């Protein structure tokens, strides 16, 4: 607190000298200058006049001493409150007329004046100053919808919104027309090509069955059955008068198995051994 008082004293001394200078040059009263300073800064400074006579011939000179009060904070708060209350303007009470719009302009060239347009349907505000999207408007719309549902009537629609008309299907239409339209809408099913059967794989059992069939065929005839040399070739003994008596040529019948990819050479011929001649 003492530090604050010392600071205020150091500030008040040049302020007092400035007030005296205003009095001497511009003939402004010292008290008036100090009061203005206190009002602006919130300080409480008082100036005391002391009459001092230097000589008998000279006129009396006044001395001013600046005095600072001990509670500058309270006085500063008071002066601030007074300045705020003085700066606040009072609310303008304008009488409203019922026939015109109740809106009052708050800014612009017509500030404080009432709107002169007459609203429609005995409304309080005109179309320009109507309160939109308010809570009351939403509540009234909801109440209207509930009343319409209970009464069974359609709710009032807003402007610019088109109502969707329900689609009516006639009951007296021909079955032929419906069937033709249904057939038109259907697409033709694509024709599927038959699948090719997969290639059959040959096994050892199928080859054995073929050999058995060949033996059964030759057993029914007078000629002897063909012989298998073990390499897959079948040959038969057949004698002819045209051939020489010493050598008997046998024709070889190639036997192809289903599992074998490469056929045997047809030009291969086998000659009978000496054991066959003896028989």
Curated annotation (Swiss-Prot):
Chain intervals for the UniProt region annotation (Disordered): 136-279
Task: Provide ranges: composition bias, Low complexity.
Answer: 228-238
| Superkingdom assignment | Viruses
Name of this protein: Uncharacterized protein 032R
Task: Supply the source organism's classification.
Answer: Viruses, Varidnaviria, Bamfordvirae, Nucleocytoviricota, Megaviricetes
């Amino acid at each position: 607190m003492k530090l604050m008082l010392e600071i205020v004293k150091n500030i008040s001394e040049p302020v007092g000298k400035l007030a005296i200078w205003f009095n001497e040059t511009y003939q402004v009263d010292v008290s008036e200058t100090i009061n203005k300073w206190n009002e602006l800064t919130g300080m409480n400074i008082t100036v005391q006049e002391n009459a001092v006579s230097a000589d008998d011939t000279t006129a009396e000179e006044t001395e001013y001493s600046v005095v600072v009060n001990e509670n500058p904070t309270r006085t500063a708060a008071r002066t601030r409150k007074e300045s705020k209350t003085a700066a606040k303007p009072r609310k303008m009470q304008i009488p409203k007329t019922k026939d015109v719009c109740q809106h009052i302009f708050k800014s612009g060239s017509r500030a404080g004046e009432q709107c002169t347009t007459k609203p429609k349907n005995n409304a309080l505000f005109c179309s320009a100053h109507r309160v939109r999207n308010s809570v009351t408007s939403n509540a009234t719309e909801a109440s209207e919808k509930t009343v319409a549902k209970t009464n069974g009537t359609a709710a009032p629609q807003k402007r610019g919104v088109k109502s969707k008309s329900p689609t009516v299907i006639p009951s007296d239409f021909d079955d032929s027309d419906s069937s033709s339209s249904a057939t038109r809408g259907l697409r033709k099913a694509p024709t599927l090509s038959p699948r090719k059967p997969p290639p059959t794989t040959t096994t050892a059992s199928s080859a054995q069955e073929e050999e058995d069939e060949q033996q059964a065929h030759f057993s029914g005839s007078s000629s002897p059955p063909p012989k298998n040399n073990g390499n897959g070739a079948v040959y038969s003994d057949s004698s002819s008068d045209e051939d020489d008596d010493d050598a008997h040529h046998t024709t070889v019948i190639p036997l192809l198995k289903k599992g074998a990819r490469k056929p045997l050479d047809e030009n291969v011929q086998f000659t009978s051994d000496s054991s066959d001649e003896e028989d």
